[in-house]
Structures are given as structure tokens and as C-alpha cells.
Amino acid sequence: MEEPGQLPDFASRVLDVTDSIPPGRVMSYGDVAEYLGQGGPRQVGRVMALWGGSAAWWRVVHADGSLVPGHERAALEHYRAEGTPLRPSAAGPPSRVDMRRARWAGEGT
């Protein structure tokens, strides 16, 4: 059992994976859960919502590459700075990460 104020073990592991994703690459919420062998996309999303602010949160996205609602502008700035592959949008700025090109499967990939 965690001490009050201590980050739960699962949350700590999610944030460690998030921070290990190389610049320009992403994992989906489900990818993170699968990599850890624990939880699922919703559990990873909850961790990111509660404790992800100090991590590289923009590197964890929806499985379809869509940007985190409410954080699109900040995420796009990070993606452009890191050279993350984006899918063009006919209606203006890119609206998704190109998962085929940007997905990271874990260490050494």
C-alpha cells in the first residue's frame, strides 16, 4: 500500500514509459498498457490525466493518432519541434499523428 501523497506503482511505471518514448515518436494509451502488461487504455489515460503534466504527455495519444482534447495547440508545438510525423488535414492544421510512421513499440525500436 502506498503512503499518502506517494505516486501509485502503476502510475509511476506509466510515467517512466512515457518519459522513455523518444522525441518524434508516440505510443497509444493501449500501447503503454500492453508494454507494461498491466491495465488498459483507460487506466493509462487516467494516470496521464492525474499525473502526466510533468511527463512528456504529448507522446501518448489515442490509437487513431488524434490529439488530446484541450491540448491540441501545445501538442502540435511539441510535435513540430520534435519532428513527429503528422497526417495532413484538408481543414487546416494537422489533426492527427501519423501512427504508422510515429508509433514506438518500446526499447530498441
Give each language-model segment a name:
Residues 1-109:
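Nucleic acid-binding interface residues in structured DNA/RNA-binding domains
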